[in-house]
Amino acid sequence: MDCIDKSIRRESLRKLGCLPDHGWNLFVQSSNRYSKLLEADSKLFKAQRIEDTVLSICEVTLENKASENALTLFQQLRFYLLNYLFLEDTSEYKSVLCSLDESVYPNLLPLTANICPCILKALLALVRQHRELSSDIVKFLNSIFLALTRILNTPHSSNNNPTHTKTTIFEKVFYASHLGFFFEEIADACISALPQDACLWAMEVCNTILVSDLPCKLIDLHNDSFLHHSNYYAGFGLSYYLYLSSMKAYINSSGCLWYEDATSFWDIVKHRPSSPEEKPFLTQFQSILNLSDKFLSKTGTLRLQEKLGTSCNLFFVLVLKLALLSSSYIGFVPYTYSDWINVLLGSISEDPELLPHLIELMASLACVFPTHFQFAMKRLRLIAIYAPRFDDGNVTYAQLASRKLAQLFNYSSRDTAITSIYQFANLLSPADTPDSYLAAPKERLSISDNMSSSSSQTATVNTISNYLNVIDSVREIALTVNDEKIYGLAISLLIQKFSRKFDSRVSTELVRTLADISTKANDRDFSILVQFYSIQNKMLVKNGDEALTIAICDSRCLIARGTESNSFKRSDLLKSLLEEIIHIGIVRDTPAPELKGYYFGMSKAVQALVECVAGTDWSSLPKEEMYPALFRDMWFTLVINRFRYSVDLGETLEVDLENIAKNSPLLVFEDFGSNFESNLELNTVLRTHIEHSVISQIKSELLVRVPNIDLKPLSTSEICFLSAVLLLESLRCKSNKLSALVEYLLDPSLRDSQLPQSIRAIALYNLTSFVESLSKERRVASSTIDEFQKLLCLCCNRVDCVRQLALECMNYIMETLPHLLGIKEILFSVLELSSLLWKARTEECTDQYVPQLLYKSNKLNLSVILSDIYSCREEVLFQFNRHARSWIQNSSKAIPYQVKNLLESYLADFVDFDDLEVVELGRSLAVELGTRIVSSDRDNFVLPAFGNWTPDTSSEFMAEYTIRQRYSHVDNSILNIEGDMSTDRIDLILNEKSKLFETHLAALKSLEDDILQGNTVSPQRLRNEVRKAAAHAVQEPIFQFSVLARKIVRIPFLDFSPSSFKLGITLWNWMMNQVPSFSSFLISNIIRNWKNEIVTEKRGYFSTAKSKSPLALPMTYSPTERASFLSYKNKVMSQMIPHLLLLQLIAGNFEGFWYGDRQTAKLIVHFMKFVLKKITSMEVNLNVLTRELHFKFVSFGLRIAENLLNSPLGSRFYNLCVDAGLCWFSGMPNWTYGADKLHVAAEISVMRSLRDKLDSFLLRYPLKVSTTLKQKLLIILLNNEMYMLYTWLTPVLHGRNVRMVEPIPDSDAASSPITLEMLQVAWNVSPNIVLYAPKRFQNAPLKQMALNFVIANPFTSVKHEVALEYLFEHYPSGEFPIDRKFILYWEPMYPVSGPVMFMPNVKWNPQLLQYTMRSMESYPVSVTFFYVPQIVQSLRYDSMGYAESFILETSGTSQLFAHQILWNMKANLYKDEAATVPDSIKPILDRVMDKMINSLSGEDKQFYEREFTFFNEVTSISGKLKPFIRKSKPEKKAKIDEEMKKIKLDVGVYLPSNPDGVIVGIDRKSGKPLQSHAKAPFMATFKIRKEKLVDADPEELAVNGTEEEAGDSAKKQTYEVWQSAIFKVGDDCRQDVLTLQLIAMFKNIFNSVGLDVYLFPYRVTATNPGCGVIDVLPNCISRDMLGREAVNGLYDYFRTKFGDEDSIAFQKARSNFVQSMAAYSVITYLLQFKDRHNGNIMIDDQGHILHIDFGFIFDIAPGGITFESAPFKLTTEMIAVMGGSNKSQPFQWFQELCVKAFLACRPYAHYICQAVEVMLDSGLPCFKGQLTITHCLERFALNLNERQASTFMLHLIEQSYANKRTLMYDQFQKATNGIPY
């Protein structure tokens, strides 16, 4: 090892010793070997390798080793220490130094001086780490100490042999030096905790040396042989050195004994030292005090100084510290300490090294003995001012003193610190000013009477040093006290004291000190400081002071580095620097003599800016500060002031600008680009006078650099802008950043200007330099890879010119540097973006109306924002795919092997199968292009095309990929049975296999338990455990395989998620392929678990929970929440997909089993028979989302039946399949859920395949008549279902429809082939099939046949509500031709139908009324609550008291229901708004109200009184406002605020319009009078506390409909909102109540099919005749208010508020507008909303259009004139928002959504009309009797089929499209009421 470098050898030995076990043993062997060599030959002592060994042992010892290892180390260290000290290993440790030759003396001392202290340090470390070895080590060290003192106490030899005398002297010097080292190591070791026995021993040996006067005996030794070189001790001699080192060790060991470490007593920050209550070491500390007193006595002092021949001040300081330590322990301090301190302070000019000890001493003295506090404070302050300074860069004495001073402030009041700051700051006055304090100081002359006048005079002269000390002191006090006010005070005072009259050194130090304090100051003080720097630097431009300029620059750099990026302080500094550079640039017109330091000042500001912009995230900066504009102005300033790209900027400045450019935002930001050209022309910098010569120079430079640029049509501002862009982006390009130039074109206003071609030219100019610099790099940096990823994302940008420029740049780069695609991240990015673009394009098929705009890659940090226009997405996909192919093919020619390997890696790079999309373009592209890469064997390509096939390399590519996959996770374990197969080897293998089996079994069992207990199981864990177990199972025999396989099959069923089943099915298939003989076992276990799932768990398709009609669910007055029905869809699909995957698995393997394993095939047949029986017995959930699964079950059943038809079982099985198919049609015909076209297409495809198979069966097999009839009926129903779904899939037949399925002919909608015989056999299968058939076909005879079945089979029909509907349709009076007893048992009707049963047209029928009551009572209050207006109106016809009884009973269970009933009854007491004409129902209502109120008691009574009292107080404000009707708005407002203050807020009260929330606060200043001529409505705002469900099961909510029944998983969360409400008086609100009630019903209907439309039925509650409460729509503005704000049109408003048409915000807002426009348009037509002027149309902050004020609906119009003849309002400005024409995609979305909304609500037309019909006699002006209902039904066009209805709606859209009558009405409203349009 001698040939190895010594540092490497030493480090290697150290690392070896730190290793456990084997490494440690090798280390011990090596150490022992060298120790034996040393014993054998002492000459080896000088070998360097021995030294390295010893030092490595010492370093290993410092690590915390085990006890046995520590003993070994101790023995080694003991051996080496004795050898290096030349002591015999005997009991007396005699010296053998004299036996050495004198020639070795000069080399001997440096060697031992290096080694021995290290050994001592290591031994003391062992004492600290291993208490069990402590006594042995201390005993050994004590022996060494005794040996050394014995040698040193030995007198000189008396013989006259000079050689012997020389040896003796050297021996004493040698051992005296090592004794000093001994004490120094003890002192260092005591800094950390040492055991008490070790501390006591150290104190003892120190005391021995100091008492014995041994050092004085060595005074005559030669000092030139002294080894220790120290700044403090050099030249003192051995004697003094021994005194100092032993005293230092004494101090530290005493402190360690007391505080467990030597520094704690002196560290007054951690704690305040004080005398302990218990004093176990009193004797020791008393002896210390006695020794100290001896040395500090006058006799002892003079004696020591006389012997040593020096002042010994440093020693006396140390003695004083030891005395203070001991007296502090004892609790008594002699008065002599202060005298000694004064004496020693007088010596600081001679011995400045005393100061650190004196400072520490005084601080501790002040803490322990408060009587000395002021004494210490005064002297510390004087030291802080007048201490000498040295230019060594270390901490100054002034800093040390002020730091201790500040620490003492913690033990006094904060005022002391403030006073000191003031005192120090007041000393800062230039020497030539009258108030200069330091020029003639007085206080400093009285430190002590013992201080010499010479020292005072010296301090007087050195004022600069004193100024610097004062500044240091202020800084240290501020930073140490750490108080925000202190920071602010220090900054304020130092800024005030700043003066240019100071010496430059003082000014610069003050500036730097401010920087040190600034980062801790609050934001306000920091801003003041930043402005101070800025002002000073601006002044320096005219009056140059380079030192001060540099100091300001350094200070701001320090501040920037000390603040977090994007913090307020960094942002404030950034803003200041930018403004400063701009300001300096504007002074360019100042005469040249005044511009001294102009360029220097600007360059220094730029230098500070470099630090400031580092790491700044521009997106998080405050937008109101306009940082991009400041940067833009800064670059403009640089350009017009000679700092241009073509000018030699200087090396330093160019690097600084390059760093700024790298972190600078674009000169044009997309978010701020709405007025680019005007901002440019009005720019502050560019508006200043720019010399013509400067402009000419800029033009010529641009033309030279970018020859293709055309400057002729550009203005001066635009030319300067281009020059700034060239400078910024060329500098940025040097950092390999090119994408920023492309991003300029994202600004819409820039694109509209004349600059895009110029930007393109600059980009192409920089492109060449970008490629050149990139080609010189040996390795592509990660930042450059990020840049390429940005460029690739820009290649997919939605803006065409951005995309084209990015593609042009990428094409050039890829052609020039094809090896770039050999970088994994870049190639993967190309493929990932291809996949993202494909996914985006398919959104038209999966989520058409609300497409995702932002797409992110899960694998890479990639994101692209795309347009919502699918034609644009198609173009982007086409272009990128074409270029991506070209890039990869080009690179594969240059680096084929790298590209091929990366393509294989990409294909292999996925977590699991469920992470893959069904179609991923990137993966397909990788396969396609990978198989085309030229093979290594080029001979293959000379082969001819045999068999019309051209040879390629696809087989080679797939072979390499397969090998990669096979060996990527190979486990080279002991299970590899190849090779040695001895008996021991086989036993070992079997043993390991058994262990692995147990391990996997335990892991699967743990997985099962966690899932069963509901613990969270990560997908990663589930995948890993099950995969490993499956891989092991296939290697095991049948028993072990069966054990593992059962659990591998069961776990996915327990987890029951799509991902777990995808994994499970993949593994099950793989296991069946690996071990075919176990396939039947696996299939049987899968079927057993599936059957158990169906029977016990009943999830998904086999759930017993049935989805309810939207009319049976609660109706809510809230906006449409798309997330809720998406969550429901995802929940249902997640439980349906597992069944679908299992069916695919079983069906895919059936044929193989049928011909290979008939027993297993029969098992499948029996299972399918079980499933089909479940279906036919209606034990399945026929949810609309399970349509595909249902018909796949039937299709698979038919496949099985085809194999069984020749057997007796076959006919029955086939019949069962047909019955199961018919069962789907036993419910209401439903549309699909959501906008997933792929799902609809799949459903149509499955049904078409099933229909074709049924047709073939009719032709091929003779079947029974009943089976044939059912089969024909099923075919008819399938055709109709497909026709209905096809209509939904293509609601508008335009050219934009994606061709996904074959068109369905209109003939499939007909029902003519359905015969009575078909219905008869269908009735036997399920009566619902017959009952719901008329709902599918517009066929009167079919409906009559269904009615006949009901009449003939009333007992069977009672289970079906629709049967009663047919009876009422044909017998509206209720006189049914059936036994009335059956009515009592009928399925409950919907709550909306209940009140209709009380109307006069239904004849009195007790059974019917009882059935009505049972129906109403079967629904929870949360459902019936919605129908309060209808229930109240039913009292009008309630001759038997049933409705009254229902009201009273329900009111008893729900107080909120009771309150709503009471308010509605009050509102219906009178017919007119003035409450003068009583309604005929008034007596009934009065009676019922009295009963309700009288029945209240207890809490209910109190709640009623609190609520109604509170509400009356609020509404009474309107009455009090009436005298102010003709007063000004401020007067009205003042009156409202006055009354609002009087309102008492009681517990639990609520707004009538918000019964689901409690008022917890009132904004008493929110009152606002509303415009009215003779009434006094007003608006007020309340804080309402509500509850919402968190983690509710969406499926349970949809099924059960109420939050109370939403399952245990749901948790309620409380939240608060501010809700404004309008309190109207004199206006009948009942019509608004009805309208919004109907809108809420429409919302439920639309939600039931997951339709992407938006409605917001806000709340209105009528509380009294002509009175009501109206909720204010939040975050909305009316269209007429936009007109009053001079907005030209809706499109302009959208662009102003949401950005350019290409922006995400605009596209989201436009999508929201389309969704809401479609819903309100359909409802406007159906309910005939009139008076749709712009005052009644609102736009919210998300772009939704909302309608309000429904005073004219149904058969009433303003003025009785039907002015608005259009079906709904569709003006040109609305069309403009939706694309501008009827050919645009958004408008076609509008058409499709209108059609779908119309189709979705048609099945519920009668129920909607029932809600209206019961209100006909209420006296509302909108009704014209029964004619209103007739007209309403006609508008639903129920006589048309689905396609005809869609055409009908399209015709209505065409009629409304820019209708002139609509425009005329808006003009009329503007002329009459001043409403803009």
From Swiss-Prot:
Locations listed in the record: Cytoplasm
Gene3D superfamilies reported for this sequence: Phosphatidylinositol 3-/4-kinase, catalytic domain, Phosphatidylinositol 3-kinase Catalytic Subunit, Chain A, domain 4, Phosphatidylinositol 3-kinase, accessory domain (PIK)
Broad enzyme group: transferase
Region (G-loop): 1599-1605
Cytoplasm is among the record's keywords: yes
Catalysed reaction, written as an equation: a 1,2-diacyl-sn-glycero-3-phospho-(1D-myo-inositol) + ATP = a 1,2-diacyl-sn-glycero-3-phospho-(1D-myo-inositol 4-phosphate) + ADP + H(+)
Residue stretches making up the PIK helical domain: 1305-1491
Any Pfam family: PI3_PI4_kinase
UniProt key word Hydrolase: no
Any one annotated GO CC term: cytoplasm
Residue span of region Pleckstrin homology (PH) domain conferring phosphoinositide binding specificity: 1492-1625
Keywords: ATP-binding, Cytoplasm, Kinase, Nucleotide-binding, Transferase
Residue stretches making up the PI3K/PI4K catalytic domain: 1593-1861
Superkingdom classification of source: Eukaryota
Stretches for region Activation loop: 1747-1771
Assigned EC number: 2.7.1.67
PANTHER family given in the database record: PHOSPHATIDYLINOSITOL 4-KINASE ALPHA (PTHR10048:SF15), PHOSPHATIDYLINOSITOL KINASE (PTHR10048)
Family named by the database record: Belongs to the PI3/PI4-kinase family. Type III PI4K subfamily.
Primary role: Acts on phosphatidylinositol (PI) in the first committed step in the production of the second messenger inositol 1,4,5,-trisphosphate.
Protein name: Phosphatidylinositol 4-kinase stt4
Organism this protein belongs to: Schizosaccharomyces pombe (strain 972 / ATCC 24843)
Lineage start: Eukaryota, Fungi, Dikarya, Ascomycota, Taphrinomycotina
